[in-house]
């Protein structure tokens, strides 16, 4: 049985790690390369960098962060934020990313997922879905850092992009992000049940039990968290042991 992965997420703005609450009120949680090295040493299974201020002007900053991280870290690195084209994917893979995540660009043009998967393989193409609850059992995709409603159903979109070749879904509940109230489990379960690729649950982790629930109740293949790790509430080792004790297969440190 495949092991469940724990993935610390580093939101990067202007070359620094920040952690927002509901995508605002950013806090400085340090240098991304230092944080990545620390997480690698601590036993994280993968890392995720999201460039939340991605613009043409600061792309060079992010490429530098990715290159320096890849030089020091040996766990898989997923990079997203401002990824718009196959050439963006190529540039990030060459810089040292193992996987590249589309978000808004995949909503605007799902075929970009197919183009990237055809060139580089589904195993390195992730689609990040930011969803908000609109009514019980219904979730809508928002883009541009959660500011722009799309009218697109999250479950249907997940099925569309996996059919196009996405090898993984990074699912963030925007209602829960930064709240520490736990994952949106109905959303996570609905997406996990609807697709045949791994789903990474994101948004809302406040306790180690929340990580367990993302897998046992949400059906996720991996769990992503930021603030509980960034600010020292729990270590990766504690999280892995807690999940293992709950019967979840983990790569223990």
From Swiss-Prot:
What Gene Ontology cellular-component terms does the record carry? cytoplasm
SUPFAM superfamilies in the record? Ribulose-phoshate binding barrel
This protein's pathway reads:
Amino-acid biosynthesis; L-histidine biosynthesis; L-histidine from 5-phospho-alpha-D-ribose 1-diphosphate: step 5/9
Where are the annotated coiled coils located?
A: none
GO molecular-function annotation terms? imidazoleglycerol-phosphate synthase activity; lyase activity
Output the superkingdom of the source species. Answer: Bacteria
What chemistry does it catalyse, as a reaction equation?
Answer: 5-[(5-phospho-1-deoxy-D-ribulos-1-ylimino)methylamino]-1-(5-phospho-beta-D-ribosyl)imidazole-4-carboxamide + L-glutamine = D-erythro-1-(imidazol-4-yl)glycerol 3-phosphate + 5-amino-1-(5-phospho-beta-D-ribosyl)imidazole-4-carboxamide + L-glutamate + H(+)
An individual GO BP term: L-histidine biosynthetic process
What EC number(s) are associated with this protein in UniProt?
4.3.2.10
Stored Gene3D superfamilies: Aldolase class I (3.20.20.70)
Q: Which UniProt keywords apply?
A: Amino-acid biosynthesis, Cytoplasm, Histidine biosynthesis, Lyase
Compartmental location: Cytoplasm
Q: Which residues cross the membrane?
A: none
Q: Which residues form the active site?
A: 11, 130
The record's section on InterPro entries has: Aldolase_TIM (IPR013785), His_biosynth (IPR006062), HisF (IPR004651), IGPS_HisA/HisF (IPR050064), RibuloseP-bd_barrel (IPR011060)
One Pfam family, short name please?
Answer: His_biosynth
Task: List, alphabetically, the NCBIfam families matched.
Answer: hisF
Quaternary structure annotation from Swiss-Prot or TrEMBL:
Heterodimer of HisH and HisF.
Function as written in the Swiss-Prot or TrEMBL entry = IGPS catalyzes the conversion of PRFAR and glutamine to IGP, AICAR and glutamate. The HisF subunit catalyzes the cyclization activity that produces IGP and AICAR from PRFAR using the ammonia provided by the HisH subunit.
UniProt-listed HAMAP family = HisF (MF_01013)
Similarity section: Belongs to the HisA/HisF family.
Q: What is this protein called?
A: Imidazole glycerol phosphate synthase subunit HisF
Origin organism of this chain? Answer: Roseobacter denitrificans (strain ATCC 33942 / OCh 114)
């Amino acid at each position: 049985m495949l092991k469940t992965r724990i993935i610390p997420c580093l939101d990067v703005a202007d070359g620094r790690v920040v952690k927002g609450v509901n995508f605002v009120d950013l806090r400085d949680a340090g240098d991304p390369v230092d944080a990545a090295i620390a997480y690698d040493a601590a036993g994280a299974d993968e890392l995720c960098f999201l460039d939340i201020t991605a613009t043409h002007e600061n792309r060079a900053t992010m490429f530098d962060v990715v290159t320096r991280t890849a030089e020091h870290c040996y766990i898989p690195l997923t990079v997203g934020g401002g990824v718009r084209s196959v050439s963006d994917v190529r540039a990030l893979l060459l810089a040292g990313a193992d996987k590249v995540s589309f978000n808004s660009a995949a909503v605007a043009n799902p075929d970009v997922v197919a183009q990237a998967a055809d060139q580089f393989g589904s195993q390195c193409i992730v689609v990040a879905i930011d969803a908000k609850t609109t009514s019980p059992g219904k979730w809508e995709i928002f883009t541009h850092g959660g500011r722009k409603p799309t009218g697109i159903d999250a479950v249907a979109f997940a099925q569309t992009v996996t059919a196009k070749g996405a090898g993984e879904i990074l699912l963030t509940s925007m209602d829960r992000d930064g709240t520490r109230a736990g994952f949106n489990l109905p959303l996570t379960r609905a997406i996990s049940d609807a697709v045949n690729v791994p789903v990474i649950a994101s948004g809302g982790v406040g306790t180690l039990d929340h990580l367990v629930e993302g897998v046992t109740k949400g059906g996720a293949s991996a769990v992503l968290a930021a603030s509980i790790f960034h600010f020292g509430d729990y270590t990766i080792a504690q999280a892995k042991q807690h999940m293992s004790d709950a019967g979840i297969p983990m790569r223990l440190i």
